[in-house]
């Protein structure tokens, strides 16, 4: 019996945040998460069981075979992924594979770009190797956020919505005082795309 993955949705859009913002991508949203973050905007419990081949076919269909970047997101994709099965094996038309993870699981070696959005209880030395970190700006997490304020780390700070009010000015002020950080806004939400 072939391994299946619980997939919430697969869609073609633009990456809306971080280092690859604005880049066309097919998003593969995995169901399930080991966190229950109050600010999460993802319905990560529902989904359809799919084999690796079905996922590859859906990705090809989503971008009409244009070979764009693939973003594995969730939920928490590392709960279902491993080195044992490469969802996108090397071929002549190899895609660039990115993952968005909370940093609590092992990232498969076949991933090209790792964006980690750690939660406060994940120590820096316990996170998987990553290319960029995305931190939600919360004044109660300043000590944790400052752990990423060092050379060699691409760190994005993102304002959060609390009771319908974004903390944009506080986020901007923090970045101006800590210039190693970069601002990340959810472009896809600003321009009204998925």
Regions found by a protein language model. Name each.
Residues 5-9, 24-25, 36-111:
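Conserved Radical SAM active-site core
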Residues 27-30, 48, 117:
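Solvent-exposed, non-transmembrane amphipathic alpha-helical segments
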Residues 67, 78-194:
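Conserved AdoMet/S-adenosylmethionine-binding subsite of the radical SAM
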Residues 1, 24, 46, 134-136, ...:
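Short N-terminal micro-motifs specific to bacterial/archaeal maturation
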